[in-house]
A protein has these predicted regions:
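Catalytic core and acceptor-binding pocket of nucleotide-sugar-dependent glycosyltransferases
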Residues: 42-193
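Surface-exposed beta-strand-to-loop junctions
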Residues: 2, 32-33, 131-134
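C-terminal helix/juxtamembrane-tail motif
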Residues: 194-214
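Short, hydrophobic/aromatic alpha-helical segments in well-folded domains
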Residues: 19-23, 38-39, 51-52
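Short beta-strand-to-loop acidic/aromatic patch adjacent to the donor-nucleotide binding site
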Residues: 30-45
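Active-site-proximal specificity loops/subdomain of glycosyltransferases
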Residues: 1-31
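Beta-strand elements of modular eukaryotic interaction domains
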Residues: 25-26, 34, 107-109
């Protein structure tokens, strides 16, 4: 794992486990219906001139993202086999959206919504079914033994429980986290640095698959 980003970081593993399931239990968050995860050091390239939470509510959306990309294979080797066994044990019927995250052989295709930008309803993760799933995953210690990220964990559950109509791609928001950016072609509201390379249709982006998925 030393060749993988954060592959030897215990602190990063703590963070991924925290955001996968524990953060919703914090008492300061108990009175809120929606949240928007914003990390330090990120850039927003567009003026956001509307209430994203109200928009989500008005349009019956439960989860929102700006970047979808492939996960590093070594970090999630056992995540899908364990998830598949969980679904079998609990006799959970998958929503059609789960197929977005699977290849033609029924295995995880590594696509996920990048959760450093995540607008969602708390109810997704407060659902007893999700807490049961998180507890099940946690027993396998994959957050530490492999470096499971909260992004693939959240994404798989979104695929299991939601329909595509409940998930929103914020196409009107330009954003950068670390070395990955997305730019919006709206000169009156958005300004992307010349150095930024739009990740939307990069070979490791899953956006094209999302836009084509029915």
């Amino acid at each position: 794992m030393s060749q993988v980003k954060y592959g030897t970081s215990v602190a990063y593993r703590h963070m991924c486990r925290w955001f996968s399931g524990l953060f919703v239990m914090h008492p300061l968050l108990s009175g809120y219906e929606f949240y928007w995860r914003v990390e330090p050091g990120v850039d927003f390239y567009c003026k956001i001139n509307y209430d994203v939470f109200q928009w989500m509510e008005d349009n019956n959306k439960s989860y929102g993202f700006v970047i979808s990309l492939l996960e590093l294979p070594k970090t999630v080797t056992s995540l899908w086999p364990i998830t598949r066994e969980y679904l079998k044990q609990r006799r959970i019927t998958n929503s059609t959206l789960l197929n977005f995250f699977l290849n033609d052989y029924g295995n995880y295709n590594l696509c996920h919504f990048w959760s450093n930008f995540e607008i969602a309803r708390f109810s997704i993760w407060r659902d007893p079914a999700y807490l049961d799933y998180f507890t099940y995953l946690d027993r396998w210690d994959g957050f530490y033994l492999e470096r499971w990220g909260d992004a693939p964990v959240h994404s798989l559950w979104v695929g299991i429980r939601l329909n595509k109509s409940q998930v929103h791609f914020f196409h009107d928001i330009g954003y950068r986290h670390d070395t990955i950016s997305r730019c919006v072609n709206d000169g009156s509201r958005c300004k992307c640095p010349k150095s930024a390379i739009n990740f939307d249709f990069h070979k490791d982006s899953c956006l094209a698959r999302w836009l084509e998925y029915k």
